[in-house]
Amino acid sequence: MDGTVIRSAALASLLIAAPMVAEAHQLVVFASVDCEAVTVEAKFSNGNPVQQADVRVLDGQNALLVTLPIETDGTVTVPLDSVDHSEGLLIEVDTGSHDNYWIVTPDDIARNCQS
């Protein structure tokens, strides 16, 4: 093969592989709530849990309430009695190179606390 064919094949391979690499690094954040706590889960789009990240919990006015390290299984639990959740919560997960967030509304908390 001549150099042009080799370069064309290499470029085609790069164009095919590049979107897969970018997709593998998307950060997915989910939070569920019950009457006692918010459970935060963070993983990459390939399903691997985030193993190192800071989880910031902010109130409805965007004031920082607490920062917690994520567990190696990609989760962290925030006890509701440790934060002012009257106006909802903004949960931010930051791995250092990727970040994303989840909003927990007052209605989410109230709905899950009904007996």
Name every feature range the model reports, one short phrase each.
Residues 10-12, 22:
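Cleavable N-terminal signal peptides
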Residues 21-39, 43, 61-62, 68, ...:
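Beta-strand-rich domain onsets/edges
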Residues 70-80:
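Glycine-centered loop-to-beta-strand initiation motif
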Residues 46-51, 84:
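A short beta-turn/strand-edge loop motif at beta-sheet boundaries
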Residues 1-10:
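Bacterial N-terminal signal peptides that target proteins for export
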Residues 17-19:
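N-terminal signal peptide c-region/cleavage motif recognized by signal peptidases
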Residues 85-98:
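Short, aromatic- and glycine-rich surface loops/edge beta-strands on solvent-exposed regions
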Residues 53-57:
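Hydrophobic beta-strand segments
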